[in-house]
């Protein structure tokens, strides 16, 4: 009778602790240890209540989260592997990596805590796999160095890694990702994206919200963005196939290749080439030394110290502003649609061997200087009655005005 009362008392006490949020271990947690080739592996699995928020925080290892439409609770499996020939040594290290799982309020926690000193074993790997209901409102994942992979969640997802890669797909709300140096890849995300890596590449397939992508030196590629983007890289290339809204792209030295942009564009590179297929708004493009090609834009400011410039001006229905095209040493070719109305002013400073040519009779070209001495070219005119100013200047190079077809 006394033992029965003690058992009942213990059960009631544990239940009270669990309800108060002080019970750390999951009730359904199980542990298995087995030989894995020359190493030893431990598998810890368990189940937690299907709450709306998940926090995973581990000292080492990868984290994988998958959302399921029919998933009710939260199921997790932690697999740890130590490269120890001795089972006794392996068990000692397994004991030093504490895995706890619990629910407190509306948040489920899964924690991997290395307690064996500041230095973790060299021959060690781990992965935490978590199955969650798709209707999670927030999933936050943190690892000191492993990869992070999350998909199939209707809410917001946040991930932080000390240096591993990060992958998101099929996320219903926004995402935030930060890694010390790994790559970041995003499939389809419905909300806003905030992506930061110390030096890895960033790739986004389809974003329905605004995109902020920053990397210390890797390349950035966006296939489709629905609401504009800000892209910054310390030196990698930038590629955007399609983006609605305003786009700002900046790199310390890589090339920038843009497709169809549904708003104004700001482009800046320390020395790479710039290419743009079309834009609905005004374009500002600047490079320290590469060529610039802007096709299908209403107006543009393009500047390079030593490259050629090609610009095609068309009426896109957007705001039209003054255009200014300038290079220190290179040719400039301007294609003008038949309905574009502009005031043209062009000049070539050192025109020996270079000149200004025009397919438009209303653009008048004249030269100054002797045939064998310093010579310069200028051109002025109004097309379709005039409009915003189109200023074109090169220190040494040809300038050509052509009909856009």
Stretch-by-stretch model annotation:
Residues 1-405:
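Intrinsically disordered, low-complexity terminal regions
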């Amino acid at each position: 009778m006394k033992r029965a009362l003690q058992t009942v008392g213990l059960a009631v006490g544990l239940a009270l602790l669990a309800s108060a949020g002080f019970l750390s271990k999951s009730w359904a947690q199980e542990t298995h240890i087995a030989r894995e080739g020359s190493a030893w592996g431990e598998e810890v699995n368990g189940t937690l209540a299907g709450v709306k928020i998940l926090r995973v925080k581990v000292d080492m290892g990868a984290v994988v989260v998958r959302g399921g439409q029919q998933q009710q609770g939260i199921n997790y499996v932690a697999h740890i592997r130590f490269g120890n020939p001795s089972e006794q040594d392996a068990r000692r290290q397994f004991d030093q990596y504490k895995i706890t799982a619990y629910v407190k309020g509306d948040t489920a926690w899964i924690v991997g805590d290395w307690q064996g000193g500041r230095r973790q074993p060299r021959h060690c790997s781990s992965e935490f796999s978590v199955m969650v209901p798709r209707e999670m409102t927030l999933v936050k994942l943190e690892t000191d160095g492993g990869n992070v992979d999350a998909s199939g969640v209707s809410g917001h997802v946040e991930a932080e890694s000390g240096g591993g890669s990060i992958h998101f797909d099929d996320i219903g709300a926004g995402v935030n990702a930060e890694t010390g140096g790994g790559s970041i890849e995003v499939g389809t995300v419905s909300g806003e994206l905030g992506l930061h890596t110390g030096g890895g590449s960033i790739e986004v397939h389809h974003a329905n919200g605004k995109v902020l992508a920053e990397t210390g030196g890797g390349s950035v590629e966006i296939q489709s963005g629905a609401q504009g983007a800000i892209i910054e890289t310390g030196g990698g290339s930038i590629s955007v196939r399609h983006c609605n809204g305003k786009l700002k792209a900046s790199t310390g030295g890589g090339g920038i290749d843009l497709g169809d942009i549904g708003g104004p564009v700001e482009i800046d590179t320390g020395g790479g080439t710039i290419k743009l297929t079309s834009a609905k708004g005004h374009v500002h493009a600047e490079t320290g030394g590469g060529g610039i090609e802007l096709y299908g834009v209403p107006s543009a400011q393009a500047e390079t110290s030593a490259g050629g410039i090609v610009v095609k001006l068309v009426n896109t229905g957007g705001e039209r502003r003054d255009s200014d095209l300038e290079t220190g040493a290179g040719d400039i070719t301007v294609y003008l649609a038949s309905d574009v109305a502009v005031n043209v002013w062009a000049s070539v400073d050192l025109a020996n061997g270079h000149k200004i040519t025009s397919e438009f009779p209303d653009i008048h070209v004249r030269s100054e200087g002797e045939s064998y001495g310093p010579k310069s070219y200028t051109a002025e005119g109004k097309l379709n009655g005039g409009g915003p100013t189109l200023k074109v200047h090169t220190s040494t190079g040809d300038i050509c005005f052509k009909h856009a077809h």
